[in-house]
């Protein structure tokens, strides 16, 4: 299938004097319908001994569902149910780490995250903190983690976030929303089972899928774009267009969106996201708006920066009869807007990717507030 050429307009150049990052990738992946059933076989060789448990962090949505009975519990393994109603917080990570350390004499054999982006990010952060001193907020930033994380496995139950493949774990801290960006964050193993996404409600499916779509648009139109990120971004965009604008079967749609999420995550791993994500962080920090919805609330007003992408987005919204919340920022005070603007502008790498090195002169605080006021 052909995607729109003007969505892939950045010219790729090379520079022999550039020092390139040596990014990590997930070393092992299982993909396929029903592949969750192989989890026991995957974990068995990684168990240290009978006293070193596997800790399963699971979205509490599944607490009374059949999925729990399929988890290969042995010895003193523990399941911890976690609510995904709110964005993952640094203090939440610290509390889980403390609970594990107080409960078990031996360090766990590994951490398994089962859920959407919130659970996948929590599991990555817990795996890091169990092998590193201090608190989660100490590692919010870039390359601050000094020791490898505990063995950890990611199993997404919704598609779109790219958290299963990324080298970041985005956390809401006391002062900022920022990821733990580290080579030690990436999962050691991922299981991609499209059947696990069957229970996802329609709107959540759409908003999380749009996270993936926006990853593609921001990556493919960014100044950080390179042939590596472009190849993944183009494939992810192609899959998103098939899923959200073409008539494919439900089963095929689940497969394609799960792979779009993977490819979209790979694209931004070697480039960066852009304006929608930076502004969404502000909405999440101040108003607690979930990431996928926040991206959509912002992206609909970014036609000046991503004209073709926003046009496609509106077609997707119309096709699936999605109603975005209105008047979200209507009653905010000037102090509220100052917080939104400061949080968003703090994401400097995202702005540089979107607008170039002169981004501070292009996106002034006043101009940014004007966009927020439309939401």
Locations of regions flagged by a protein language model:
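C-terminal charged capping/lid subdomain of soluble metabolic enzymes
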Residues: 2-11, 16, 24, 313-375
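ATP/NTP phosphate-donor binding region
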Residues: 2-110
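Glycine/threonine-rich beta-strand-loop-alpha-helix active-site module
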Residues: 91-195
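Glycine-rich phosphate/pyrophosphate-binding beta-alpha loops
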Residues: 160, 266-290, 295
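Carboxylate- and glycine-rich phosphate/diphosphate-binding segment that chelates Mg2+/Mn2+
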Residues: 168-270
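Short alpha-helical scaffolding segments that buttress acidic/His motifs in well-ordered protein cores
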Residues: 213-217, 257-265, 279, 299, ...
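Catalytic phosphate/nucleotide-handling subdomain of diverse soluble enzymes
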Residues: 281-320
């Amino acid at each position: 299938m052909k995607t729109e050429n003007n969505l892939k307009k950045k010219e790729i150049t090379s520079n022999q004097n550039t020092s390139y990052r040596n990014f990590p990738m997930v070393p092992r992946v299982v993909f396929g319908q029903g592949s969750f059933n192989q989890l026991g076989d995957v974990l068995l060789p990684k168990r240290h001994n009978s006293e070193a448990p596997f800790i399963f962090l699971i979205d509490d949505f599944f607490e009374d569902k059949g999925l729990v009975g399929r988890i290969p519990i042995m010895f003193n393994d523990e399941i911890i149910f976690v609510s995904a109603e709110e964005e993952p917080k640094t203090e939440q990570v610290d509390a889980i780490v403390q609970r594990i350390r107080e409960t078990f004499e031996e360090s766990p054999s590994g951490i398994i995250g089962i859920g959407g982006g919130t659970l996948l990010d929590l599991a990555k952060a817990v795996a890091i903190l169990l092998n590193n001193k201090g608190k989660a907020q100490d590692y919010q930033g870039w390359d601050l983690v000094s020791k490898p994380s505990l063995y950890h496995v990611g199993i997404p139950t919704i598609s779109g976030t790219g958290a299963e493949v990324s080298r970041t774990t985005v956390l809401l801290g006391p002062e900022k929303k920022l990821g733990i960006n580290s080579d030690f964050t990436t999962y050691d193993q991922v299981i991609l089972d499209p059947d696990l996404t069957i229970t996802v409600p329609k709107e959540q499916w759409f908003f999380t899928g749009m996270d993936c779509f926006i990853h593609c648009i921001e990556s493919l139109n960014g100044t950080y774009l390179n042939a590596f990120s472009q190849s993944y971004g183009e494939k992810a965009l192609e899959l998103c267009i098939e899923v959200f604008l073409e008539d494919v079967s439900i089963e095929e749609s689940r497969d394609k969106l799960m792979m779009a999420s993977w490819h979209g995550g790979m694209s931004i791993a070697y480039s960066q996201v852009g304006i929608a994500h930076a502004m969404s962080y502000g909405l999440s920090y101040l108003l607690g708006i979930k990431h996928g919805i926040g991206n959509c609330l912002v992206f609909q007003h970014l036609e000046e920066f991503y004209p073709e992408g926003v046009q496609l987005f509106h077609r997707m919204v119309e096709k699936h009869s999605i109603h975005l919340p209105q008047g979200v920022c209507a009653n905010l005070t000037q102090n509220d807007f100052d917080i939104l603007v400061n949080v968003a502008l703090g994401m400097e790498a995202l702005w540089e990717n979107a607008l170039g090195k002169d981004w501070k002169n292009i996106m002034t605080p006043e101009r940014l507030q004007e966009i927020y006021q439309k939401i």
